């Protein structure tokens, strides 16, 4: 769910806002797989992105496993988050983290992935840092840490199936009704 929403958000920033974007996956191989299976399919299946991709389906310097450069000049990078070198030399407006809980907490003793990645948006007029993941072990989970450090706390409210009153989703254990 989150990954598909993230692709929609990145597509919006590429087509409507002309913003350079950088998406981090936990590893280089995960980033390559993501580019092949998700990004290329999205570009192929979304008409406005396909129109910005004259290189689609062929070898071209603007069509690599780490970068998609669109005819509008906008760039989209997808890199692994395990190597410190991947957090350098990119100036973007949007940085995204997919499966943040699977990242190492310290990247080659240079800092956390979000600390290093968010440096890429420091010069942007409209900086965006987007983070998401399936939560893992409480107390050591990076998405939990990111949520706790966030200036914003949002909940998704749904109507109670019995009385209709709005309530937020709270997950419990087997004994929770």
Residues covered by each model-derived region:
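Phosphate/NTP-binding elements of NTP-utilizing enzymes
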Residues: 1-177
């Amino acid at each position: 769910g989150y990954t598909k929403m993230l692709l929609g958000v990145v597509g919006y920033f590429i087509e409507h806002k002309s913003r350079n974007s950088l998406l981090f996956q936990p590893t280089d191989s995960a980033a390559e797989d993501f580019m092949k299976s998700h990004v290329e399919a999205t570009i192929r299946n979304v008409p406005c992105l396909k129109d910005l991709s004259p290189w689609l389906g062929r070898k071209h310097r603007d069509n690599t496993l780490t970068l998609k450069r669109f005819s509008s000049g906008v760039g989209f990078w997808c890199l692994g988050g395990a190597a410190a070198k991947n957090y350098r030399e990119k100036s973007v407006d949007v940085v995204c983290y997919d499966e943040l809980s699977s990242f190492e907490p310290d990247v080659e003793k240079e800092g956390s992935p979000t600390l290093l990645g968010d440096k890429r948006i420091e010069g942007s007029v409209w900086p965006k840092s987007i983070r998401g993941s399936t939560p893992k072990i409480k107390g050591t989970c990076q998405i939990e840490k990111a949520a706790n450090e966030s200036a914003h706390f949002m909940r998704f409210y749904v109507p109670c199936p019995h009385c209709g009153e709005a309530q937020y989703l709270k997950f419990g254990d087997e004994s929770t009704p």
